[in-house]
Amino acid sequence: IMVNGHRIGYVPDKHGNWVKASDRAMAPIRSEIGFVFQRFNLWPHMTVLENIIQAPVRVRGMARDEAIAIAEELLRRVRLSDKRDAYPGRLSGGQQQRVAIARSLAMKPALMLFDEPTSALDPETIGEVLEVMKELALGGMTMVCVTHEMGFAREVSDRVVMMDDGVIIEEGTPEHFFLNPTHERTRQFLSKIL
């Protein structure tokens, strides 16, 4: 996988061969990747705004005022401007997940990774998070999303991958994947959820 011209996890040696990268060599590449987990991992002792500005200020060295301006714009994008000064414990699961998305976006990543971002949510709040993710995709954000939300995957993806026991068994466009899967396991999976 390449991010902004860098192969993730590897660097070329003096002979041009790819070798495993050290943690130090990976740090600049990692800073280009946002990650949103199943659990929101918000700091409970910090407000929504403080959660969002923490990494840009501490990791990127961004001025606090600039980080606040970016955070306020991101809160507007995820429709949580009114929660700026709230603590995570006062938010619904869907609201917390949208804060987690805003927090990742505050680092201005080239790529966003989502690990089952709706699996820990109540059914009523899933749509809030999927709508924000859809807007990101439509805005051109490159995303890799592990999900069982097949309607979302079908609508937003340009590639769909099916894994079984850690092995890719099917890959293709949404049309291919949902209408003409080639692997029997994929057909079984789709018949149970669609």
Predicted feature descriptions by range:
Residues 112-115:
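Catalytic Walker B motif of ABC-type/P-loop ATPase nucleotide-binding domains
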Residues 123-125:
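Helix N-cap at the start of a conserved alpha-helix in ABC-type nucleotide-binding domains
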Residues 86-89, 107, 139:
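Conserved signature/switch motifs of ABC ATPase nucleotide-binding domains
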Residues 171-172:
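ABC ATPase "signature
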Residues 46-54:
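Short coil-to-helix segment of the ABC ATPase nucleotide-binding domain corresponding to the Q-loop/switch region
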Residues 153-155:
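A short, surface-exposed alpha-helical micro-motif characterized by mixed small hydrophobic
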